[in-house]
Amino acid sequence: MGKLDGKTAIVTGGARGIGLAIARRYIAEGARVVIADIDEGGKAAAASLGVAARFVRTDVGAAGDARNVVAEACGVSGDLDILVNNAGIIHTADFLDIAEADFDRVIRVNLKGMFLIGQVAAKQMVAQVKAGKPPGVIVNMSSINARVAIPNQVPYCVSKGGVDQLTKVMALSLAPHGIRVNAIGPGSIMTDILKGVATDQAAKHRLLSRTPMGRIADPDEIASVATFLASNDASYITGETIYVDGGRLALNYTVPVAGN
């Protein structure tokens, strides 16, 4: 018997990487999963996971799409039990150079999108509780960059800081209904974005020099935490961000010092 038997989940950004790993693990634990992604590759991803998965093309920053994907998920079994807010993008530019449009684009996906789908999903979950059904669970994807800034990742760092606070606000608002909301803060995970860095030995060395465990994590390791948070094993945990970073945030490391 799986930890998520009979549950219906939405995983945004589920076409690849961490989102796909979470979708795969949820299905292995007995859940039905709706992969919500703007990437049409989500269709093939869902097909690869079998009959327990379906794909709904979703722009998380569009309110209409947020309502649609929740309705589609409820069409699977009548209820929505789990939402994983995983969709996210980056834009690399220095603070002095980044354009307003690029800043807005990242915030729209990473933070506003999480709010939009989170609110629609939460309203559905509250209605289910009022109907005498079990409370749902929401898992938001944060990052160590909610706590540790990178100079050329301005909107990403800002958005993830916002995710941590949004998670707390959601948790407090929904606790009276028994609905739990937590976040996961990954460190260096072997996604498509990081694979390019991992093949550059100098870049990989810099990455590992600030990772005490000395390796890059696999997306399945994030999926394990997402499964725990969605399950009854985490029944008294809400409003928390669990950092999965190989010890990165515990490390107090030095920076280069200019000569006198």
Label each PLM-derived region with a short phrase.
Residues G118, S159, T167:
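Active-site helix of classical SDR
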Residues T238-N260:
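Short C-terminal tail/terminal secondary-structure segment
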Residues L96, V148-V154, P176, G214, ...:
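Active-site loop immediately N-terminal to the catalytic Tyr-X3-Lys motif
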Residues A183, A202-D233, I237, G246:
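C-terminal helical subdomain
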Residues D94-F95, A99-I107, L207:
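Substrate-binding pocket helix/loop in short-chain dehydrogenase/reductase
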Residues K123, L172-P176, S235:
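Alpha-helical segment proximal to the catalytic Tyr-Lys
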Residues S143:
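Residue(s) in the substrate-gating loop at a strand-loop-helix junction
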